[in-house]
């Protein structure tokens, strides 16, 4: 896929599933589970040991399928360079460290955190593809609606943080282009327990909203 095709694919599939754990094997099993559930956009965070290896192995597993695999919690240049070893489809920086843009190739889709209108527009003009609004549940859907139906309709937004099942439709109606799902689905305790059937059930409950 081209970069633009990846952006369209991410928006079309709506949910970005985030795997955050300190267990490499658990992260890989979680990835397999999310794929089985029907997830199409999946992120490995830098908290996972050898997360660049996890990204590379995950991409190899699904190379014949339309599934995007990315790197998350990419806080600085060092982590960005490490992530590039896995050749991720996208990179997520939860803050505003524009230094990572110096080492992330232009063909990669980039998400970057923004909490205020000023931060959000700064991201846009820096060339960021999606602004990650976090914690979205605290700001609420009205915050996103005020921007998307107001001065910033051209900014693509990822709503993440506290995105429980019951509020998803409100955020989508408010204009959120993508919804980030981390501990709402791939809960650390479930990964540690090896309860991947529950993770699959949770993932499917969100994905069913797209049917």
Predicted regions located by residue number:
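Alpha/beta catalytic cores of nucleotide-metabolism and tRNA/nucleoside-modifying enzymes
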Residues: 1, 24-25, 115-121, 125, ...
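Conserved N-terminal beta1-alpha1 strand-loop-helix module at the mouth
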Residues: 1-87, 165, 173, 193-211
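Glycine-rich beta-to-alpha transition loops that act as phosphate-gripper elements at the mouths
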Residues: 20-24, 71-77, 93-96, 112-117, ...
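Generic hydrophobic/aromatic pocket-lining and core-packing "Φ" positions
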Residues: 31, 55, 80, 100-101, ...
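Glycine-enriched alpha-helix->loop->beta-strand junction motifs that scaffold or abut catalytic
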Residues: 35-40, 62-64, 84-91, 106-111, ...
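Short secondary-structure capping/turn micro-motifs that flank functional sites
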Residues: 49-51, 78, 99-100, 119-121, ...
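Glycine-rich phosphate-binding active-site loops on the catalytic face of alpha/beta enzymes
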Residues: 90-100, 133-140, 176-196
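Histidine/lysine/aspartate-rich catalytic loop segments that bind and position anionic ligands
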Residues: 97-139
């Amino acid at each position: 896929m081209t970069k633009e095709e990846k952006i369209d694919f991410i928006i079309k599939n709506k949910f970005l599933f985030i795997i955050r754990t300190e267990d490499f094997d658990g992260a890989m099993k979680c990835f397999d589970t999310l794929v089985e559930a029907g997830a199409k956009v999946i992120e490995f965070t830098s908290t996972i040991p050898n997360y660049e290896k996890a990204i590379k192995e995950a991409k190899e597993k699904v190379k014949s399928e339309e599934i995007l695999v990315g790197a998350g919690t990419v806080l600085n240049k060092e982590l960005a360079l490490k992530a590039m070893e896995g050749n991720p489809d996208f990179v997520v920086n939860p803050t505003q460290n524009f230094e990572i843009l110096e080492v992330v190739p232009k063909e990669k889709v980039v998400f970057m955190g923004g909490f205020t209108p000023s931060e959000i527009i700064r991201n846009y003009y820096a060339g960021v593809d999606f602004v990650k609004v976090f914690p979205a549940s605290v700001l609420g859907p009205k915050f996103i609606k005020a921007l998307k139906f107001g001065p910033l309709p051209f900014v693509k937004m990822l709503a993440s943080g506290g995105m429980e099942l019951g509020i998803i439709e409100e955020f989508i109606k408010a204009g959120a282009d993508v919804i980030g799902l981390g501990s709402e689905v791939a809960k650390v305790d479930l990964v540690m327990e090896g309860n991947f059937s529950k993770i699959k059930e949770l993932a499917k409950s969100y994905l069913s909203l797209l049917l």
